[in-house]
Amino acid sequence: PMMVLYSGSTDPFSQRCRFVLFEKGMDFEIRDIDLYHKPEDINVMNPYGEVPILVERDLVLYESNIINEYIDERFPHPQLMPPDPVERARTRLLLFNLEREIFKHVHTLENRASSDEARVKAREAIRDQLTGLAPAVAKKKYLMGDEFSMLDIALAPLLWRLNYYGTVSYTHLTL
């Protein structure tokens, strides 16, 4: 395979990238990394020492949304970002908002060093954000309407892990 994804099997950010690669029907290799005993080369490839990391020949990318946008541009079918620049910019803004409003709390829950108090606050914040999001998406097939998009991919791994995180199970929020 020409692409290698360094990934944590339970890491929601890695799962986003796996999702996109499978959605594109790509030939790629997954190298699962033990998130608590990372090999040294992870720090060489990503100065933040985090997965996912995508390697394709001389290109090394990290940060799930950046990796996924690259894959989407490189292999345009099926297209996961809107073709229109205005809609694409709106989608990027929504992805950014998801990171700031929801996924910063996911980082807290994924981090073993987080205090119990921080975890409780993170769970509440995630619950509040998803509850706020629910009415907007309740009548749509996907987050952006009828089209499956990068936003669905960004959010899906969180929804899969809600029970694990100890947040309320959102039976009405189906992806």
Question: What does each model-found stretch correspond to?
Answer:
Residues N43, E117, Y164-Y165, Y170:
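A generic membrane alpha-helix/interface feature
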Residues L143-S169:
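GST superfamily/GST-like fold recognition
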Residues T171-L175:
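Conserved small/polar residues in nucleotide/adenosyl-binding loops
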